[in-house]
């Protein structure tokens, strides 16, 4: 009898220990980030001019990178960048591999169910890049055409809605543009600012841009939903950066223009 009681007690304690362990694992993405002085930032470093590496260099640079560095400085954190495929950023936030994703991520309702977003910091839109001699002169001409996109993006979602379009998915926007250059697709559906930057930098490729109407969207910094303290501190830093002109200076560095004054403080996605 005593032996059975002892066994029951031991079994119960063991079960409690397992539950406690599982409970700790389930919350690691949010709680560990709050305690650590290191801010692990995930980015997909192929999205010029937001995050990229110059040829022959391992150093990250870009609009998002400068913003992330400034936020880390203002929140008293040591920064650690991790290069992550774009469609792996949300899972990396969930499992605690990274604390924050700074990667030109559009705030959408679907993503808001999985992550916590900062206030919007950039207004974007969509565009199709084609060759100057292309038969595609407008959006109506995209029907039945072969279009390159970066997988997991709002551009990919949009391309899949085009009647009869053959959509080719790529890991990186740069790969989608390379496929266009090599003649493997007839157009690349990507973010407008990236299209503008690329076409301006590669005038020898004779490309042109067709802006996609009614596709206004906003980028936000993504974090684990459990880490509300980090979301609050990031928003505080972004607010200060707007007020003291730091964010505008970063805009001018990368886009040669001032930050738009009508970017909303809050945004519920689309």
Where are these regions (language model features)?
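Short helix-initiation/N-cap motifs at beta->coil->alpha
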Residues: 65, 81-92, 134, 151-154, ...
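Extended ligand-binding regions for polar small-molecule ligands
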Residues: 65-66, 70-74, 151-153, 220-259
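Flexible hinge/capping segments at coil-to-helix
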Residues: 130-147
């Amino acid at each position: 009898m005593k032996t059975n009681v002892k066994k029951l007690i031991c079994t119960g304690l063991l079960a409690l220990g397992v539950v406690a362990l599982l409970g700790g694992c389930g919350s690691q993405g949010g709680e560990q980030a709050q305690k650590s002085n290191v801010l692990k930032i995930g980015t997909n470093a192929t999205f010029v001019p937001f995050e990229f590496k110059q040829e022959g260099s391992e150093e990250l640079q870009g609009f998002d990178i400068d913003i992330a560095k400034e936020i880390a400085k203002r929140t008293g954190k040591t920064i650690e960048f991790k290069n992550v495929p774009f469609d792996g950023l949300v899972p990396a936030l969930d499992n605690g591999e990274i604390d924050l994703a700074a990667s030109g991520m559009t705030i959408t309702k679907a993503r808001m169910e999985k992550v916590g977003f900062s206030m919007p910091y950039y207004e974007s839109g969509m565009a199709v890049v084609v060759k100057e001699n292309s038969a595609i002169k407008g959006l109506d001409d995209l029907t039945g055409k072969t279009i390159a996109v970066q997988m997991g993006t709002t551009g990919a979602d949009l391309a899949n809605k085009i009647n009869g379009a053959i959509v080719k998915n790529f890991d990186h926007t740069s790969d989608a543009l390379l496929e266009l250059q090599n003649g493997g697709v007839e157009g690349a559906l990507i973010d407008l600012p990236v299209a503008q930057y690329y076409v301006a930098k590669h005038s020898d490729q004779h490309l042109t841009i067709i802006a996609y109407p009614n596709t206004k969207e906003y980028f936000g910094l993504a974090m684990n939903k459990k880490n509300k303290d980090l979301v609050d501190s990031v928003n505080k830093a972004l607010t200060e950066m707007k007020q003291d002109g730091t964010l505008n200076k970063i805009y001018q560095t990368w886009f040669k223009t001032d930050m738009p004054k009508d970017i909303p403080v809050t945004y519920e996605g689309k």
